[in-house]
């Protein structure tokens, strides 16, 4: 029975950890949460796009 509980806990940890990697930056709050900045033009040379802020035209940029 202890093994059953251990496997259940491991399954929960694997599923909960995987859900964080599938989230996409789509609004200003999640952009700031991911250490990004909303820039109304394309990202500068020292930054890369990690998502969008207000639709497809405003990128969320973060430093490399």
Swiss-Prot record:
Tissue occurrence: Neutrophilic granules. Alveolar macrophages.
GO molecular function: CCR6 chemokine receptor binding; chemoattractant activity
One protein family per Pfam: Defensin_beta
GO CC, any one term: extracellular space
Cellular location(s): Secreted
Main location (coarse class): secreted
Disulfide bonds: 31-60, 38-53, 43-61
Residues the record lists as Pyrrolidone carboxylic acid modifications: 23
GO biological process: cell chemotaxis; defense response to bacterium
Leader peptide range in chain numbering: 1-22
Swiss-Prot/TrEMBL keywords: Antibiotic, Antimicrobial, Defensin, Disulfide bond, Pyrrolidone carboxylic acid, Secreted, Signal
Highest taxon of the lineage: Eukaryota
Known role: Has bactericidal activity. Active against E.coli ML35 but not against S.aureus 502A.
PANTHER family: BETA-DEFENSIN, DEFENSIN BETA 4A
Family, as annotated: Belongs to the beta-defensin family.
Protein name: Beta-defensin 5
């Amino acid at each position: 029975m202890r093994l059953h509980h251990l496997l259940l806990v491991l399954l929960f940890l694997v599923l909960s950890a995987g859900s964080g990697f599938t989230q996409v930056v789509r609004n200003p709050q999640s952009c700031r949460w991911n250490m990004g900045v909303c820039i109304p033009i394309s990202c500068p040379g020292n930054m890369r796009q990690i998502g969008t802020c207000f639709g497809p035209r405003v990128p969320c940029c973060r430093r490399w």
